[in-house]
């Protein structure tokens, strides 16, 4: 998929006219982004993720335009797999199998990837070997461990990790304790078990934590509500085995075992269809830069404090209003009632299990404390909890139990404490 997104699919070696002038050259998009976004970043880093400066006091670029041009040659000759050796430009989309090398379209000359790789890649090794050497060079680059480690910490724990935190995790990237480099399971374990991720004292500092990105906030709500479908199956993209949309004319439709075949009645809350309401949807990033930039700075006090707030880049005035409105609609639609009683769910409708919550409905303090723990990690202020309890007390005595639960839930979900991960 990334080859498709970054125009590397069917990327062909350069062609020349009779005088030797280039007629076409390899597309450089993927070569640039695989370095900038997916491995080493733009500038050299210290092992703790801080900038490594040159003798002139300026940041040191990790690569240059020549590096991009040379690396683009590595990625030539790859296309969708086909048994036809001449199908480089015509093979149909195939998202289930690896790309295939078509040697006639690969640049088999030498490639000088300096400063990423000190020794040029020799000529006539074939596309697979060229690719292996180039990826190994990026994987072994001293920037990769701190660059990837910091990004993972930002996504999983806090937007502004300390250099010491980044260093500890990067060392686990370099060696998982068994001599293996790049063991992401060990890296994630190091991130989540680090002192800075577990310490209540660290969590209390103003700079610690992160805004929950909307799609994870929503999926966390679904988990917290123990949502499931009666069929055990969930609505997703409806595709055939070759990745094409299902239509009445589709010649090779997938079987029910290969795809979520949903009937007409299913949940309106689909994680691939909520971007207009919450600024995110599963698999719908508008660019390869993700929904937001990892170094986004919000002008004002946070910028003055030197803090980055990546997820706030998609939290503008519009979405600051639409997200709570979406949550209100979500709570009402996902917890439907008929005269105060739960409505039977269709086989593919996500339905929460509120058995525990309904046992607490006559104890507003216990209900609020429960939602505080599940959705705000116990961080709701005493004032916020008191206000939610007051709102529940103010409901008419005739209010159905499920509606009381919905009220407490919505008021909790729309608090700042429920939106921030600490």
Provide a role label for each language-model segment.
Residues 141, 145, 149-178, 189-422:
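Flexible, low-complexity segments enriched for small/polar residues
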Residues 1-241, 419-422:
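Active-site substrate-binding loop specific to GH73 endo-beta-N-acetylglucosaminidase modules
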